[in-house]
UniProtKB/Swiss-Prot annotation:
The gene is xkiA. It is found in: Cytoplasm. GO terms for biological process: D-xylose metabolic process; xylulose metabolic process. It catalyses: D-xylulose + ATP = D-xylulose 5-phosphate + ADP + H(+). This is Probable D-xylulose kinase A. GO terms for molecular function: ATP binding; D-xylulokinase activity.
Length: 573
């Protein structure tokens, strides 16, 4: 049966995050035509959750009830139907799932998935499909012991990062599975399949187990990125006495093509909602990989998410793993990697200094006005003359992971001429000098850790991103945008990306468009780049590269690295 209105097919991207499920519908021109949401706290019935999760403080566990996600999918599909979506026009479906979370399917799962009754909801039919009713959330911190084992197993954190793209983290699926099989050996024995949240979503639409996506599998500490296969040694650690073959069966295969046709939608959705039987299911990916698909991000473009935390994402052909960073396979484009940095201290650190500045200068209607003005009036690195030392600091209201430090504040003077570094507050006009220093501190850390991943844009310019895209609350701030450009560069400038909080769902929907409309060998960046109407989504908000200033910050990066090492050594003592 051909897609009705074949000239106007529609595509759905689902985003299953910690606090809500979204279903977003786009057409071939990438225009959003429908959006349906289910907020777990506001809309779910019968689950003792707060902010989408259940917390067991005693064991540092944070997890979500999987049946709640079934309830959410039932409701989101009903919402799209009520809005008037003609499901027969939907040609493809993909999704984005919160990364690292695992779902444990029981013995009867595949049978239940295959034999869904269209007169009943998913929640009514699949609540018993799981050997374990909960999925660990990325905020879970119960696996310190297992992380230590993973970090040691190949010899060092560096070796684990080299193999899998990341050192061990509490939230990563490998350490989580290791703890799970030790804590619940009987449940693990009766687990037929382990899905990631992304492949769980795809499985629901297929009516059978969907494979992991080539990018999301990199968030497990089990996939050897360079070999393009599971790491046999790490599987051995993770499987324990149950054995590697059993774990491999539970994990299932992984395919290279992010646009793979996994098969047609299950009959259940055809009969219940009127989907076309030819509607194709495309592998769902993780929420971070989906974010870089929300625009045609070119290799060496950088995306900085300035929310409560700071996340830095980049598409790069260079694989240079380090324990402080993350590398994943790119979700659509072979030969590219997604580079990611996550910081706990983002907006909170800036707001603390903003409030101190307002206390000193008096507050106005615009709470950021004093902060912005002060930051822009302060010369780069607080240097009134080139012979003055550079002022730099670390400002962590909460413990940080990059670098691994307690909460605190440290201020230094750095002299690039002789490389000397002194911890001091002398010469600092507190808190006014800190308005610029906090932005510089956050951006210098990004520049330090993304060194070697960019190339020269030509014209004799130093290596830097082509464009820097800012998203999230901090992107509205003029001082942050200007200073970000001065430090990170951006041969074409700094842009504000306006896609609200729908980036993951958009990226998933675009992935479905690309998978089903690409010509032979056409890349995601090429197809989406041709159709993406730049003026609808982005606005240039600052210059990027500025000769002289960029190079001065290049010198500052050396001092910044020394400062971090010195503070780390002091804290060890």
């Amino acid at each position: 049966m051909a897609i009705s209105a074949a000239q106007n097919p529609l595509y759905i991207g689902f985003d299953l995050s910690t606090q809500q499920l979204k279903g977003l519908v786009v057409n071939s021109d990438l225009k959003v035509v429908y959006l349906s949401k289910f907020d777990f706290d506001a809309d779910s019935r019968g689950f003792p959750i707060k902010k989408g999760v259940i917390t067991n403080e005693a064991e540092h566990e944070v997890y979500a009830p999987v049946a709640m996600w079934l309830q959410a999918l039932d409701t989101v599909l009903d919402g799209l139907r009520q809005q008037g979506l003609d499901f027969s026009r939907v040609k493809g479906i993909s999704g984005a799932g919160q990364q690292h979370g695992s779902v444990y399917w029981g013995d009867r799962a595949e049978d239940l998935l295959q034999n869904l009754d269209p007169s009943k909801s998913l929640e009514a039919q699949l609540s018993d499909a799981f050997s374990h009713p909960y999925s660990p959330n990325w905020q879970d911190a119960s696996t310190q012991k297992e992380c230590d084992e993973f970090d040691a197993y190949l010899g060092s954190q560096e070796a684990l990062a080299q193999a899998t793209g990341s050192k061990a983290h509490h939230r990563f699926t490998g350490p989580q599975i290791l703890r799970f099989q030790r804590k619940y050996p009987d449940v693990y024995r009766h687990t037929q399949r382990i899905s990631l949240v992304s492949s769980f979503l795809a499985s629901l639409f297929l009516g059978r187990f969907a494979p992991f996506d080539i990018s999301d599998v990199c968030g497990m500490n089990l996939w050897n990125i360079k070999q393009g296969a599971y790491d046999e040694k790490l599987l051995k650690l993770c499987a324990g006495s149950f054995g590697v073959d059993d774990l491999k069966r539970k994990l299932g295969p992984v395919y290279e093509d992010g646009g793979l046709n996994l098969g047609s939608i299950h009959r259940y959705y055809v009969d219940r909602y009127g989907f076309n039987p030819d509607c194709t299911i495309i592998p769902a990916t993780g929420d971070n990989p989906a974010t870089i698909l929300a625009l045609p991000l070119r290799p060496s473009d950088a995306m900085v998410s300035l929310g409560t935390s700071t996340t830095f994402l980049m598409s790069t052909p260079s694989y240079q793993p380090h324990p402080a960073t993350h590398f994943f396979n790119h979700p659509t484009t072979a030969g590219l990697y997604m580079f990611m940095l996550c910081y706990k201290n983002g907006g909170l650190a800036r707001e603390q200094i903003r409030d101190a500045v307002n206390d000193k200068l008096g507050s106005s209607d615009d709470v950021w006005a004093n902060f912005d003005r002060t930051a822009l009036q302060t010369p780069p690195l607080g240097q009134k003359a080139d012979s003055d030392p550079m002022k730099m600091g670390l400002f962590f209201p909460r413990p940080e992971i990059v670098p691994n430090l307690r909460s605190g504040q440290w201020r230094f003077d750095y002299n690039p001429a002789d490389g000397s570094l002194h911890e001091t507050t002398a010469g600092w006009d507190q808190p006014l000098d800190e308005a610029r220093a906090i932005i510089e501190s956050q951006m210098l850390s990004l520049r330090l850790r993304s060194r070697g991943l960019t190339s020269s844009p030509g014209d004799g310019k130093p290596p830097q991103p082509r464009r820097v895209y800012l998203v999230g609350g901090g992107s509205k701030n003029k001082a942050i945008a200007k200073i970000a450009g001065e430090i990170l560069g951006g041969s074409e400038g700094v842009y504000k990306l306006e896609i609200g909080d729908n980036a993951c769902a958009l990226g998933a929907a675009y992935k479905a468009v690309w998978a089903l409309e690409r010509s032979n060998g056409q890349t995601f960046e090429d197809l989406i780049g041709q159709r993406w109407k730049e003026e609808d989504f982005i606005e240039k908000i600052a210059d990027g590269y500025q000769p002289g200033v960029f190079e001065k910050y290049g010198q500052a990066v050396e001092g910044f690295e020394k400062m971090e090492l010195q503070v780390l050594q002091q804290e060890k003592k």
